[in-house]
Amino acid sequence: MVRRSFVMLAALIALALASLISTAPAQAAGNAKVYVVHGIPGRDLGLQPSLPVDVSVNGACALTRFKYTDTVGPIELPAGSYDIKIHLSASLSTPPCSGPVAVAATVPFASGENATIVAHLTDSGAPTASKFMNDVTPASVGNGRIMARHTAPLPPVDLIVKTFSSPATLAVIPNLANGQQVSAELPVNTRFRIQFALAGTTDPVRVGSVKARPGETVIYHAVGSVRKNTFTLIELRVQQ
């Protein structure tokens, strides 16, 4: 996992987005498969709640009004570096990518990797972007692969796994810090309850639900603030 921090929020989101936009052949051998998740609520930073941005890549406007909780991917991306510019989204009547340029950057990706870039907040509430490798290892028969990523402005948490039909705890994943992820197998087509509790406690600060699916890695990103009521789980489904 690689983390980059940026001064401007729009810059960090767009840096992730711009990495994904390409006119490369869809099935070229050796390409990287890249996804991106917008996990920063503007409300947490006193900005427009959906925090839309536009992205130009190699001089062309490639993505417009990408908003909080949106996802993009997979994009087949040949190994190499991509020149991008990030624009703050203006009004709908304004041409795309005509807003102020927040940043210009060159972003590399390696051949053959399967990755997600997540724009999110650190445990102290500062904007950042983290690159995670996606675990696409096939699960055993009858199971599916679930990944959970701590990308919310919270200190380390314990993930407590339960079913909806019983109060019994099935598993506890302790001390997961902001910017970290875990991968596990769960029976497919069964919804499980995931409680987020501050590390060493049992009282959940938030509760979500997850569901494993055959042939996919289902990734859940915890994003947003509990204090400002923007906390949510963003689901991303990656083919194995």
Region locations from a protein language model:
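Bacterial N-terminal signal peptides that target proteins for export
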Residues: M1-A10
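Intrinsically disordered, low-complexity polar regions and short flexible loop motifs
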Residues: T23-Q240
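Bacterial N-terminal signal peptides
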Residues: A10-S19
